[in-house]
Design a protein with these regions (language model features):
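Bacterial Sec-dependent N-terminal signal peptides
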Residues: 1-26
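Non-catalytic cap/lid and distal C-terminal segments of serine-dependent acyl enzymes
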Residues: 21-289
């Protein structure tokens, strides 16, 4: 396992404006802009090395006693959702905003999202079209047995654990919520691909629905105006997301908080950023001075 700095070089570009004739070569003093670290974990569960993009909040000091919430981000590659979600976390944790506590973000870089984020399907066409699918059980074992213990050992985290997933990532986050809910205590589920296996996950039994379930969990489910899912049998993304919210809201447990957020101005491609921004307002309660 090794840690490498993520370095972004901010290239200064200038043009001649109002007679200004500064020579770029003489005045340019580029410096690295450090956003976080790149870490690696060797997974026995997945039989591969996984890249972790990690944002550490301002003031993070390995030598002090402060511990931080951790936000796990699916599709967390640098060219996916890591950078803009880190921006939301940093912005919302500013001293004059304090919507979100200063947090560590762990972006799990993608290798094969269809393999990692889907459970086995009974739909023949999907098996043939996407032959690597159906191994979410291994990815969940990786998260539970390897990733979370690694983060616990190597970074200063407290007991607050959030997962963010969109599309197939939202499907996986939903599967974890229903099958292994105590892995996280905050779930941000966006445009979940509940059409997978003809919506079978909506019929999944779960202990979170029982009155005996006694762990506090906050759940945000966001969806845009997205229409028909890519299935042979007609399914509507908005309808499935609402059905999921209603299923969880019907729980007999008093320890669940469920927020359903319909964003008709957003579609499947644009919803992620605004939805996470909304989720932070709903599921984080910060005492403001």
């Amino acid at each position: 396992m090794k840690t490498i700095l993520i370095i972004f070089i901010l290239t200064l570009s200038t043009t001649i404006v109002l007679g200004q004739t500064n020579n770029l070569n003489e005045t340019d003093k580029n410096k690295p802009f450090i956003l976080g670290v790149i870490d690696e974990i060797q997974s026995k569960e997945l039989n591969e090395t996984r890249i972790l993009n990690i944002y550490l909040p301002e003031g993070y000091n390995p030598k002090d006693t402060t511990k931080y919430p951790v936000i796990y981000l699916l599709d967390g590659s640098a060219d996916e959702d890591f950078i803009h979600i880190v921006g939301l976390v940093q912005f919302n944790s500013l001293e004059w905003i304090k919507q979100v506590p200063k947090s560590i973000v762990v972006g799990i870089a993608t290798v094969d999202r269809r393999r990692d984020f889907t459970f086995p399907t009974t739909i023949t066409e999907d098996k043939e079209a996407y032959p690597t699918t159906g191994h979410s059980d291994k990815f969940i074992s990786f998260v539970e047995k390897e990733l979370q213990p690694y983060i616990q050992t190597n970074y200063k985290i407290n007991s607050s654990k959030t997962i963010i997933g969109q599309s197939l990532g939202g499907l996986l986050a939903t599967e974890i919520l229903l099958k292994k809910p105590t892995l996280f205590n905050k779930y941000i589920i966006i445009s979940p691909s509940l059409w997978w296996d003809n919506g079978s996950l909506l019929n999944q039994s779960s202990k979170i629905l029982d009155s005996s379930f006694d762990q506090q969990i906050d759940i945000y489910i966001g969806v845009g105006k997205e229409g028909l899912a890519p299935t042979k049998l007609p399914r509507v993304m908005e309808v499935d997301a609402k059905l999921l919210a209603e299923k969880i809201k019907a729980s007999k447990s008093k320890y669940l908080k469920v927020f359903f957020d319909y964003l008709p101005q957003e579609n499947h491609a644009t919803i992620m950023h605004q939805s996470v921004f909304n989720a932070f307002k709903l599921i984080y309660t910060i005492t403001k001075e």
